[in-house]
């Protein structure tokens, strides 16, 4: 299987930070942490920033990934949260 550029750059296990941008709703952070907890149990401390108008939240959360597949799987699951607008 062909590796992409990101996968080639990472050495596992590694710390990987997701930045999730979504609607400023109270359940956003809980949904993000719940999805990550299901795949990689642990204590997570998300960093939360609000947009200037308060319509959006930016949540940064760091995981310890063991495989590239974990990173990819979480990316797709976080992207599928209905109030999420972008995952970086």
Swiss-Prot record:
SUPFAM superfamilies: YbeD/HP0495-like. InterPro entries: UPF0250_YbeD-like, YbeD-like_sf. Gene3D superfamilies: 3.30.70.260. It holds the Pfam family DUF493. One of its GO terms (cellular component) is cytosol. Belongs to the UPF0250 family. This is UPF0250 protein bbp_432. It comes from Buchnera aphidicola subsp. Baizongia pistaciae (strain Bp). The lineage of its organism: Bacteria, Pseudomonadati, Pseudomonadota, Gammaproteobacteria, Enterobacterales.
């Amino acid at each position: 299987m062909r590796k992409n550029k990101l996968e080639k750059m990472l050495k596992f296990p590694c710390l990987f930070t997701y930045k999730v941008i979504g609607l400023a709703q109270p359940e956003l952070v809980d949904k993000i942490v719940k999805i990550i907890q299901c795949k990689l149990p642990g204590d997570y401390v998300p960093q939360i920033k609000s947009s200037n108008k308060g319509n959006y939240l930016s949540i940064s959360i760091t995981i310890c990934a063991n495989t590239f597949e974990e990173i990819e799987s979480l990316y797709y699951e976080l992207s599928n949260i209905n109030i999420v607008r972008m995952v970086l």
